[in-house]
From Swiss-Prot:
The lineage of its organism: Bacteria, Pseudomonadati, Pseudomonadota, Gammaproteobacteria, Enterobacterales. The system is composed of three essential subunits: KdpA, KdpB and KdpC. This is Potassium-transporting ATPase KdpC subunit. It comes from Sodalis glossinidius (strain morsitans). InterPro entries: KdpC. The chain crosses the membrane at residues 11-31.
Length: 192
């Protein structure tokens, strides 16, 4: 019995050492060396303090800020530990009610909008944490932000364009705007 148990335990502890200790340490070390920002969560700092991550959306409710997609996380919006497949089915009446409420709220907050409400402003992403919106959704909000900030709409269009990330190849993905980065650029523009 001991003849069989000793090699089995040796292999078990060796694999635990390799897969649970050595491999994570090597991968973490390489990530810290090659991609230090991403390895730390892609944090964004303002005045030396972390104020968010470019990977997780945030709630912006003031009229002078661009708003992102609604969060689908439970209890607290954009709560990463609570992220899950939380979207309702298209056939669920609760989804229809939530979308109607969001459309009504957005139209009240954006009375000068001249196009239908972009779909991503009223529907959550699969994770409920998406930090991006389409350039069209950002452009749709420009009249409200321009009025609240007393800025010309043309300047905000340029700011949206400057903060639009385009895919490397035009047929892989869509252009997106990171709402946190856009709002930080807007604040920096107002300060400067």
């Amino acid at each position: 019995m001991m003849k069989l148990l000793r090699p089995a335990l040796s292999v078990f502890f060796l694999l635990v050492l390799v897969t649970a200790v050595a491999y994570p340490l090597v991968v973490t070390g390489l990530a810290q060396w090659w991609f230090p920002g991403a390895a730390q969560g892609s944090l964004v700092t303002q005045d030396g303090q972390p104020c968010g991550s470019v990977l997780i959306g945030q709630t912006f409710t003031r009229a002078g800020y661009f708003q992102g997609r609604p969060s689908a996380t439970a209890d607290t919006p954009y709560n990463a530990p609570a992220s899950s497949g939380s979207n309702l089915a298209v056939s669920n009446p609760a989804l229809d009610d939530a979308v109607k409420q969001r459309v009504t709220a957005l139209l009240q907050a954006n009375p000068h909008a001249d196009a239908p409400v972009p779909v991503e402003l009223v529907t959550a992403s699969a994770s409920g944490l998406d930090p991006h919106i389409s350039p069209a959704a950002a452009l749709w909000q420009i009249p409200r932000v321009a009025e609240a900030r007393h800025l010309p709409q043309a300047e905000l269009r340029r700011l949206v364009d400057d903060n639009t990330t385009r895919p490397l190849l035009y047929f892989i993905g869509e252009p997106v705007v990171n709402v946190l980065k856009l709002n930080m650029a807007l604040d920096a523009r107002q300060k400067g």
